[in-house]
UniProtKB/Swiss-Prot annotation:
Protein name: Elongation factor P
Modified positions (N6-(3,6-diaminohexanoyl)-5-hydroxylysine) in chain numbering: 34
Protein family per UniProt: Belongs to the elongation factor P family.
Keywords annotated in UniProt: Cytoplasm, Elongation factor, Hydroxylation, Protein biosynthesis
GO CC annotations, alphabetized: cytoplasm
Post-translational changes noted in the entry: May be beta-lysylated on the epsilon-amino group of Lys-34 by the combined action of EpmA and EpmB, and then hydroxylated on the C5 position of the same residue by EpmC (if this protein is present). Lysylation is critical for the stimulatory effect of EF-P on peptide-bond formation. The lysylation moiety may extend toward the peptidyltransferase center and stabilize the terminal 3-CCA end of the tRNA. Hydroxylation of the C5 position on Lys-34 may allow additional potential stabilizing hydrogen-bond interactions with the P-tRNA.
Organism in which the protein naturally occurs: Vibrio atlanticus (strain LGP32) (Vibrio splendidus (strain Mel32))
Function: Involved in peptide bond synthesis. Alleviates ribosome stalling that occurs when 3 or more consecutive Pro residues or the sequence PPG is present in a protein, possibly by augmenting the peptidyl transferase activity of the ribosome. Modification of Lys-34 is required for alleviation.
SUPFAM superfamilies: Nucleic acid-binding proteins, Translation proteins SH3-like domain
UniProt xrefs under SMART domains: EFP (SM01185), Elong-fact-P_C (SM00841)
Length: 188
């Protein structure tokens, strides 16, 4: 298995720490006036999702994580597993609820999602940055009600609740940013 030195650390690099794959979020190289240089690293453990800050001596070596990101189309949820399919080979992969986690509210059939596989098992599911989902429940916007934020909560077909403008009605399709959970626009 290939190894990587702390001198080669950069954002997005995936390596093994305590027998668990981790991804670097941010890396800062520090060379004090006296003493050995070191790296101050902010990283995310891919299995648990925890974000940590660690300090490593300059020149330390770590094993690269055997982690692969693949793009697969979302098919359906059978209650226990979320099923995805490779649109070229038609190979199907099932991800458990733990791997999907908070992404479940943004999964729309046939949307292409990014699955992170470790030892051929999905450990995280990332939905597309923007999804288009139908509004299934929202209060009617009252004419002239412009006081306050000018928005109202709307429940989407996937169960997610998003704050939308007053003019959005039930049955309309809205575009939502999955990274922030915010309304982006109405789909024509």
């Amino acid at each position: 298995m290939a190894s990587v030195s702390t001198n080669e650390f950069k954002g997005g690099l995936k390596f093994m720490l305590d027998n668990e794959p981790c991804a670097i979020i941010d890396n800062e190289y520090v060379k004090p006036g006296k003493g050995q240089a070191f790296n101050r690293v902010k990283l995310r453990k891919l299995l648990s999702g925890k974000v940590l800050e660690k300090t490593f001596k300059s020149g330390e070596s770590f094993e690269l994580a055997d982690v692969v990101d693949v793009e697969l189309g979302y098919l359906y949820n059978d209650g226990e597993f979320y099923h995805f399919m490779n649109n070229e080979t038609f190979e199907q992969i099932a991800a458990d609820v733990k791997a999907v986690a908070d992404s479940a509210k943004w999964l729309v059939e046939n949307d292409v999602c990014t699955l992170t596989l470790w030892n051929d098992n999905p450990i995280t599911v990332t939905p597309p940055n923007f999804v288009e989902i139908e509004v299934t429940e929202t209060d009617p916007g009252l004419k002239g009600d412009t006081q306050g934020t000018g928005g109202k909560p709307a429940t989407l077909a996937t169960g997610a609740v998003v704050r939308v403008p007053l003019f959005i009605a039930i049955g309309e399709v809205v575009k939502v940013d999955t990274r922030t959970g915010e309304y982006v626009g109405r789909v024509k």
